[in-house]
């Protein structure tokens, strides 16, 4: 019943400049960019290699989402920095400090789970289970600080990690606790 995580999304942020003129950026030919400051204060820009989406703000800050690895998120941000430098922004940090804000991963225990039994066995301390509201059980792991969504199909979503190891450890903790309680069948 070995299970490992699959990274589904990495959210990373950085500061590429002191500030950005988003109107100028739109006029400079950033293909596919979307900016409507009435709807959202940032410019939205997507790339395909590596696949990522960016939220670019006037403060010079950038949020990158949609990458499947930390390396791809970092590469995407460097690509963005080079693109912006070449089309409109001279004062760009080409070696920015990239910080991972969140990793979302999935895993499959490859067995069906009785969520009512799990909720009763774990009590109310770190678990929320309201099937009328949400079909999964929400299990909060304290260290590392991750949240594991557990579904009756045995599929899990692990979120809140700052590195893949946080998600792996969250999975290991949940599997160990389920196994110790005899809940994996």
From Swiss-Prot:
Protein origin, superkingdom: Archaea
Primary role: General factor that plays a role in the activation of archaeal genes transcribed by RNA polymerase. Binds specifically to the TATA box promoter element which lies close to the position of transcription initiation.
Name of the protein this chain belongs to: TATA-box-binding protein 3
Gene source species: Methanosarcina mazei (strain ATCC BAA-159 / DSM 3647 / Goe1 / Go1 / JCM 11833 / OCM 88) (Methanosarcina frisia)
NCBIfam families linked: PRK00394.1-2, PRK00394.2-4
Pfam family, one: TBP
Database matches in PANTHER family: TATA-BOX BINDING PROTEIN
Family membership: Belongs to the TBP family.
Gene Ontology biological process terms from the UniProt entry: DNA-templated transcription initiation
Annotated keywords: DNA-binding, Repeat, Transcription, Transcription regulation
Presence of keyword Repeat: yes
Segments traversing the membrane: none
Start-end of each Sequence repeat: 7-84, 100-178
An annotated Gene Ontology molecular function: DNA-binding transcription factor activity
């Amino acid at each position: 019943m070995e299970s490992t995580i699959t990274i589904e999304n990495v959210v990373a942020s950085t500061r590429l400049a002191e500030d950005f003129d988003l109107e100028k950026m739109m006029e400079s030919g950033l293909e596919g960019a979307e900016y409507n400051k009435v709807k959202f204060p940032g410019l939205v820009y997507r790339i395909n290699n590596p696949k990522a989406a960016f939220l670019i703000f006037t403060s010079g800050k950038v949020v990158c989402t949609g990458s499947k690895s930390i390396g791809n998120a970092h590469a995407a941000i460097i690509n963005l920095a080079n693109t912006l430098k070449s089309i409109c922004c001279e004062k760009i940090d080409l070696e920015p400090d990239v910080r991972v804000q969140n990793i979302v991963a999935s895993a499959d225990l490859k067995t069906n789970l009785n969520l009512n039994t799990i909720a009763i066995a774990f009590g109310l301390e770190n678990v929320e289970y309201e099937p009328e509201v949400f079909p999964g059980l929400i299990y909060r792991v304290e260290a590392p600080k991750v949240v594991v969504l557990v579904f009756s199909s045995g599929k899990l979503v692990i979120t809140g990690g700052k590195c893949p190891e946080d998600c792996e450890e969250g999975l290991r903790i949940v599997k160990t606790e389920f196994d110790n309680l005899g809940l994996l069948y």
